């Protein structure tokens, strides 16, 4: 009976597969949105102000950061929780694949969230004259919360690794 339970629990990891497939669809949609923004600004690029162009570029950077986060979560999550990817050509295998444990994934996700939040905050500051001070303050507080959380998670990870080495 115990063997059946253990095999069932182990096999249940495949229930995460549709989640990673769904994330890949999200990545496709994000890529479409990226190119939609590029096509959308092309007719106005000559007349666009420098700050307007910077805002558009910040939006593109934001999409790229979220896309990178999605790829990292999909690949490392699949390899950590479902199965190792069997890529035949070792030259095409990404260098970080198979090397990230759950804690390093959490730290990468946290630092990506801080980077994404930074881009949003920069975009907000560039349009500060149109935005209420309360909203700007709230966004700064949220960003600082992300930063402190990322530092806290990295510190905890460092301490747990140090404790693991000592034992």
Swiss-Prot record:
Membrane topology: Multi-pass membrane protein
Transmembrane residue ranges: 15-35, 53-73, 136-156
Keyword flag Transmembrane: yes
Subcellular location: Cell membrane
Alphabetical UniProt keywords: Cell membrane, Membrane, Plasmid, Transmembrane, Transmembrane helix
Pfam families given in the database record: UPF0114
Gene Ontology terms: cellular component: plasma membrane
Protein family membership: Belongs to the UPF0114 family.
HAMAP family in the record: UPF0114
NCBIfam families associated with the record: HI0507
Protein name: UPF0114 protein in repA1-repA2 intergenic region
Annotated source species: Buchnera aphidicola subsp. Acyrthosiphon pisum (strain APS) (Acyrthosiphon pisum symbiotic bacterium)
């Amino acid at each position: 009976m115990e063997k059946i339970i253990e095999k069932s629990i182990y096999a249940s990891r495949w229930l995460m597969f549709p989640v990673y497939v769904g994330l890949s669809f999200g990545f496709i949609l994000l890529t479409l949105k990226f190119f939609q923004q590029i096509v959308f600004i092309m007719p106005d690029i000559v007349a666009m102000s420098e700050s307007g162009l910077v805002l558009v570029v910040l939006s593109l950077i934001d999409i790229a950061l979220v896309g990178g986060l999605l790829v990292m979560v999909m690949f490392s999550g699949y390899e950590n929780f479902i199965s190792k990817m069997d890529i035949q050509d070792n030259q095409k295998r990404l260098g970080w694949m198979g090397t990230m444990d759950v804690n390093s994934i959490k730290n990468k996700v946290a630092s990506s969230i801080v980077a994404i939040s930074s881009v949003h905050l920069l975009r907000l500051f560039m349009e500060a004259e149109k935005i209420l001070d309360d909203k700007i303050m709230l966004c700064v507080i949220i960003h600082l919360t992300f930063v402190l959380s990322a530092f806290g998670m990295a510190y905890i990870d460092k301490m747990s690794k140090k404790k693991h080495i000592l034992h």
